[in-house]
Amino acid sequence: MSNRVIIFDTTLRDGEQALAASLSVKEKLQIAMALERLGVDVMEVGFPVSSPGDFESVQTIARTIKNSRVCALSRALEKDIDAAAQALSVADQFRIHTFISTSTIHVESKLKRSFDQVLEMAVSAVKYARRFTDDVEFSCEDAGRTPIENLCRMVEAAILAGARTINIPDTVGYTVPSEFGNIIQTLFNRVPNIDQAVISVHCHDDLGLSVANSITAVQHGARQIECTINGIGERAGNCSLEEIAMILATRKGMLGLETGINAKEIHRTSNLVSQLCNMPVQANKAIVGANAFTHSSGIHQDGMLKAQNTYEIMTPESIGLNRNNLNMTSRSGRHVIKHRMEEMGYSEHDYNMDALYEEFLKLADKKGQVFDYDLEALAFMEAQAEEDNHYQLQQLVVQSDSTEGVATATVRIEVGGEIKTEAATGNGPVDAAYNAIARATDRRIDIISYKLGAKGVGQNALGQVDITAVYHEQNFHGVGLATDVVEASARALVHVMNLTCRADKVADYKQSMQKNRELGGV
């Protein structure tokens, strides 16, 4: 048996079912091209019979993708299979995936047929699909709750009819790993023609076991895993592609299995899917979460600086990230602060480590995470332990034209003790407010990240805006809180403005310090 596991991605079919709004054809094509770069073997990209839009997107992707096999879903009905075949006909290589329910509850309650009738429908569907391609996949929907005798009969009949891949879905995420592994093992033991097909699994995450069930399945002989980027999908989601890929890569010595996934594309693909689908990845998500390679514990940080593999079983570079993160918090030790200062180019002779660490702990207790620009200010400007408020927002008035989409904002800002009033227009109220603030402060920065959230619950909740901005090639993080989202956005920008102002003062101090050194050395 081959040790190669086929990765079947269904982000654009099963994954899209979780979205509040469907993706456009262009967005689907973007994701499909990312999946091709990632190296998925098969991508299931839609259900052509369901709508003209789905048909168009499947056809467009099928025409474009060259290095992955493009697949479309169909029920065990000739009209579905016809639509799938027509949409896929422009592809270099394609697969038709047909399915029917096999569990007792589905057969009796949903299909209202006998199992024998359902078996005949499955056989007919597979045979019909074989008219269009040799690559036919058949799925036993709700296989996890199907009596094993019936499941064995269905699998044997589908293979005999011409299916080259047999998919065993845990459709409702009901099974546990030992149980699911036993199902796969029983199929290999009882189905006489099992060697004529690839056994696939498609596990849902209702009990949080989709990845564990999938790994157990390949340990028992399955050689295709159906999964999605970021684990998105119906209800609680699907098996996560990135987790499967990195489990098989990281534990290759133990599992003896491999995939064709280009792991360095994982982070990039995850971000793209998250953005286009408007589904943020939770911070503690395995592999691709913001905290996946972030270390806050002082003990962990110290270990990481001594040897990276003390607390990391894979590198961030392996999934396409540049580096891991050592968050500077009140739990960070002196070693971490010294290391960070060294990374920024400072030697211990440039600052007082004892004083810096004492001030660092005070600031960390107050604000939580401390950033590089905070550390520089603490090291070189004793009077700047508290954040400067060179800019203070006094008033913000916004007027919007709902028909034209143009907004006008007027701001009154205190700038170093002087009151300035400026007005500006923009593409929406936030853009207008930002333009007015930029005029008043005469300071231009580039916003690279804008996140809108809420602090509190119900009617008492405040809008919270978090922004990341670039100023002189350095990132600055600002937060704004207000009952109004536009005001919260403005306050976040003013927060960043104050941070950049302080950074300028630090830069001036460092420059004068360098000049003094040069003069002293003459």
Swiss-Prot record:
One of its GO terms (molecular function) is 2-isopropylmalate synthase activity. Coiled coil: none annotated. Disulfide bonds: none annotated. It holds the Pfam family HMGL-like. It catalyses: 3-methyl-2-oxobutanoate + acetyl-CoA + H2O = (2S)-2-isopropylmalate + CoA + H(+). Keywords: Amino-acid biosynthesis, Branched-chain amino acid biosynthesis, Cytoplasm, Leucine biosynthesis, Manganese, Metal-binding, Transferase. Its EC number is 2.3.3.13. Residues 5-267 form the Pyruvate carboxyltransferase domain. The keyword GTP-binding does not apply. Gene3D superfamilies: 1.10.238.260, 3.30.160.270, Aldolase class I (3.20.20.70). GO terms for biological process: L-leucine biosynthetic process. Pathway: Amino-acid biosynthesis; L-leucine biosynthesis; L-leucine from 3-methyl-2-oxobutanoate: step 1/4. Its main location: cytoplasm. Residues 392-522 are annotated as: Regulatory domain. It is found in: Cytoplasm. It is an enzyme of class 2 (transferase). InterPro entries: 2-IPM_HCS-like, 2-isopropylmalate_synth_dimer, AIPM/Hcit_synth_CS, Aldolase_TIM, LeuA/HCS_post-cat, LeuA_allosteric_dom_sf, LeuA_bact_synth, PYR_CT. GO terms for cellular component: cytosol. Mn(2+) binds at D14, H202, H204, N238. The keyword Transport does not apply. Belongs to the alpha-IPM synthase/homocitrate synthase family. LeuA type 1 subfamily. Catalyzes the condensation of the acetyl group of acetyl-CoA with 3-methyl-2-oxobutanoate (2-ketoisovalerate) to form 3-carboxy-3-hydroxy-4-methylpentanoate (2-isopropylmalate). This is 2-isopropylmalate synthase.
